[in-house]
From Swiss-Prot:
Gene for this chain: mdh
Record flagged with keyword NAD: yes
Known partners and oligomeric status: Homodimer.
Molecular function terms from GO: L-malate dehydrogenase (NAD+) activity
PROSITE patterns with a match to the protein in the record: MDH (PS00068)
Name of the protein: Malate dehydrogenase
EC number: 1.1.1.37
GO cellular component: cytoplasm
UniProt-listed SUPFAM superfamilies: LDH C-terminal domain-like, NAD(P)-binding Rossmann-fold domains
Length: 311
């Protein structure tokens, strides 16, 4: 199993690479690419960790060598948020980065499962899809927007608010991956009830959690460590699905035939072909139904921005 991380010298990329080096199945290969010249050194550093995962690093303008034979490609390349920026401010820089990297994926590893981490995910996934379509290799079951950070935040915040063991808390998060498009389905959590005020407060905190980290780091970065953990969890789930493990389910932002938008985050079953099945997200509360309906114009505009960028 070969996993490639594009953007591996960044804050998310290095955290993700460390976690993958320690958690990928024995015999796996981990390929690190970044434009930054430090990248081969990151690979050497990681290679000293005693796990049976071979690590190689590649730097420069061309990621082709890193992508050859990749089963999974995780893209975290781009600039991070700074105070005062929202995810859409990142579009002007990160859109071109994602386009160029996905063009290389299309040429070098067209069958790989591609997980997009680079923000704004609502838009960058649409960009990736259009690039793959232009190259004639688009398979909607092999492209994912990684929204796992919204899931782990939801689980963490709910457990803290209710005094629960976080390992026992499971939350589906639907919609997109920025602001009001992030919708945790708190009404579905088994054995837990919330007041209307708690639901509103938790939902808002989950939606604004990225800003919470950006402000707390005071200009020194964004959510890199928690995002690295979230991306590792999702990447390992992709690998487990590829290896034939049954019942691997994660929420992801996919082209899954949603009635709501061309791309929509919801639970999916992962397998040997990527998405094996898109699962219905089930019954929602009145609050959640209203929030879902209210987000759709924003989500669709984000998607259209990505489509138009490639055209």
């Amino acid at each position: 199993m070969k996993v490639a991380v594009l953007g591996a010298a960044g804050g998310i990329g290095q955290a993700l690479a460390l976690l993958l080096k320690t958690q990928l199945p024995a015999g796996s290969k981990l390929s690190l690419y970044d434009i930054a010249p430090v990248t081969p050194g990151v690979a050497v550093d990681l290679s000293h960790i005693p796990t049976d995962v071979e690590v190689k690093g590649f730097a420069g303008e061309d990621p082709t060598a890193a992508l050859e034979g990749a089963d999974v490609v995780l893209i975290s390349a781009g600039v991070a948020r700074k105070p005062g920026m929202d995810r859409s401010d990142l579009f002007n820089i990160n859109a071109g980065i994602v386009r160029n990297l996905v063009e290389k994926c299309a040429a070098t590893s067209p069958k790989a499962l591609i997980g997009i981490i680079t923000n704004p995910v609502n838009t960058t996934v649409a960009i990736a899809a259009e690039v793959l379509k232009k190259a004639g290799v688009y398979d909607k079951n092999r492209l994912f927007g990684v929204t796992t950070l919204d899931v782990i935040r939801s689980e963490t915040f709910v457990a803290a608010a209710k005094g629960l063991n976080v390992a026992d808390v499971k939350v589906n998060v639907i919609g997109g991956h920025s602001g009001v498009t992030i919708l945790p389905l708190l009404s579905q959590i088994e054995g837990v009830s919330f007041t209307d005020e708690e639901v509103a407060a938790l939902t808002t905190r989950i939606q604004n959690a990225g800003t919470e980290v950006v402000e707390a780091k005071a200009g020194g970065g964004s959510a890199t460590l928690s995002m690295g953990q979230a991306a590792c969890r999702f990447g390992l789930s992709l690998v487990r699905g590829l290896q034939g493990e049954a019942n691997v389910v994660e929420c992801a932002y996919v082209d899954g035939g949603s009635e709501h938008a061309e791309f929509f985050a919801q639970p999916v079953v992962l397998g040997k072909n990527g998405v094996e099945q898109v699962l219905a997200y089930g019954d929602v509360s009145a609050f959640e139904a209203n929030a879902r309906d209210a987000m759709l114009d924003t989500l669709k505009a984000d998607i259209d921005l990505g489509i138009e960028f490639v055209k």
